[in-house]
């Protein structure tokens, strides 16, 4: 969990995660220069687990030249005493002209290859063992990340999941029903089952994110049932219930498939007990592969006994020099 006041930098941290994901998937990243130091160099990095192994990847991007001037990929090992050591698979430092790669043929190529993208997207990696495996690891990691904002969640993901009658869909429905004590059912139905004329122009949801003309019919077919009466969810349900319906598919999919769910402003329009319940689904012994990273304002969530370990609670602080992220584990009892 990431805590901090408004405008402290929590959302910027989420944007950094999104930028890293886009870079690793060879998508437009939107990287910007450092506004605090007025430097053209944007530096980002991530340490992550993939298939039970620990890796780190760092890169530097020159915004003005539009070049990746630094790349480093390492695997991190632990010995029996819990000491860590890094084994470098790839290092490309164009500024200091340091080039290393476990594939010797690639090491020779690095200085002469273009810098307008990551190295693994500039060469045919299938011909090189380690660089090819590195690319698969990075893509596999980035593909598992889902990033959503509670104030702007697309309902499309839940709609697509609700169309298929399977175990995943059943769990999504149960999740939504448990979140709303008065709801009997939640389903995706044929239009003839909806007992209301939805032709009035004024009957539109308040949330802009849910008022999407091209998907309007799909959204109307999402139906909530109260005391046996079917009503369109988008017109009758509360903002909180609609947000729960939108996030439900992401939560269940993450838990079932071991994905990484990143949520900005998790506590927006959702009751504290429900926020706590969502976090508890990820933070228990039954969850072996999924992870949720979230930002919140309500510090009461930190007060939940046995909910978090100290290293799972992070704070964001901003001053005139920059934004700092630090863990509760950095503090001792005396501090």
PLM regions: where:
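Short acidic, glycine-rich loop/turn motifs
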Residues: 46-52, 74-79, 224-228, 318
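C-terminal lobe/lid and adjacent interdomain/linker elements of RecA-like ASCE P-loop ATPase modules
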Residues: 257, 277-335
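Conserved ABC ATPase signature
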Residues: 2, 201-252, 260, 266-270
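Short alpha-helix of the ABC ATPase nucleotide-binding domain corresponding to the H-loop/switch region
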Residues: 271-276
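Electropositive, glycine-dotted interaction segments
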Residues: 58-197
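Conserved P-loop NTP-binding catalytic core
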Residues: 1-65
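Short, mixed charged/polar active-site loops
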Residues: 54-56, 84-87, 230-232, 323
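Post-Walker A helix-loop "phosphate-sensing" segment adjacent to the P-loop in P-loop NTPases
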Residues: 19-30, 255-256, 283-289
